[in-house]
A protein has these predicted regions:
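Active-site helix of classical SDR
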Residues: 97, 134, 142
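Active-site loop-to-helix junction immediately N-terminal to the catalytic Tyr of the SDR YXXXK motif
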Residues: 69, 77, 124-133, 144, ...
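Alpha-helical segment proximal to the catalytic Tyr-Lys
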Residues: 102, 147-151
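C-terminal substrate-recognition "lid" of short-chain dehydrogenase/reductases
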Residues: 94, 200-228
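Short, small/polar-rich loop/turn modules that mediate ligand/substrate recognition or access, typified
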Residues: 63, 150, 155, 221-223
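Residue(s) in the substrate-gating loop at a strand-loop-helix junction
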Residues: 118
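Substrate-binding pocket helix/loop in short-chain dehydrogenase/reductase
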Residues: 73-74, 78-86, 192
Length: 235
């Protein structure tokens, strides 16, 4: 997005990490700002959006993309871990999208809110009940906000990828192997890629290209869930 001329705000719980990304962009002559944001903290979310408005004066596109993964067998799932998952993947999405909606509505120009769903917005997976719960809800929230936002020119979308080999997913491989009593190779082949048609991971670039495409949408796709799943979850 920055390469295409957008001013980018990098918001993360890890401020040092956000600053490193923003510096990489500004060193390349692009426009970026880093802010600390715990998406499950209402005051931090609002403060982060206020900082963005002070710096750039508008809120045109927001992608709600914070995430964490904690896996356990369902009957052993600690309630504290459930609450943490829901706080980030459901409450956090609500707080970020509401903050964006408020500012887009107030501007009179509208904007685009992009939610991060998952293939697990549509299919169930072992050991991930709270993740399934939240990601299904994210897709539903996008549809509801699309209805309410239309009159203000606010469009919403949910990008739903299958597994991407990020550090978060890399961490899951040994955890699932341990909990399921199988090898790491079996986790990749028989769980993560089993239901794709080509045995291929989705990539970060797939998501970035879809985000850029949606930044130019004029409402034809509002409310839709875009499935980047290599055929795993076909509409």
């Amino acid at each position: 997005m920055a390469k295409e001329g957008w001013a980018v705000v990098v918001a993360d719980l890890n401020l040092a990490g956000a600053e490193a990304v923003a510096k990489e962009l500004t060193d390349a002559g692009l426009t970026a700002l880093a802010v600390r944001m715990d998406v499950a903290d209402e005051q931090e979310v609002e403060a982060g959006f206020d900082r963005m408005m002070e710096q750039f004066g508008s809120c045109d596109l927001v992608m709600s993309n914070a995430g964490v993964q904690i896996v356990h067998p369902f009957d052993e799932y600690p309630f504290e871990d459930w609450k943490k998952m829901v706080a980030i993947h459901a409450d956090g999405v609500f707080l970020v999208s509401r903050a964006a909606f408020r500012r887009m509505k107030a501007s009179g120009k509208g904007g685009r809110i992009v939610f991060t769903g998952s293939v697990q917005s549509f299919v169930g997976s072992k050991l991930k009940e709270p993740y399934n719960f939240a990601k299904r809800g994210v897709a539903g929230l996008a549809k509801a906000v699309a209805r309410e936002g239309a009159e203000y020119g606010i469009y919403t979308y949910t990008i739903c990828p299958s597994f991407i080999k990020t550090p978060l997913v890399e961490k899951q491989i040994p955890e699932q192997a341990r909990d399921l009593g199988i090898s790491e190779e079996e986790v990749v082949k028989n769980i993560m890629l089993r239901d794709t048609v080509d045995g291929v991971f989705t990539t970060v670039e797939d998501v970035a290209n879809t985000l850029y495409f949606l930044s130019n949408d004029q409402g034809a796709l509002t409310g839709q869930s875009l499935r980047l799943t290599h055929g795993w979850a076909m509409a």
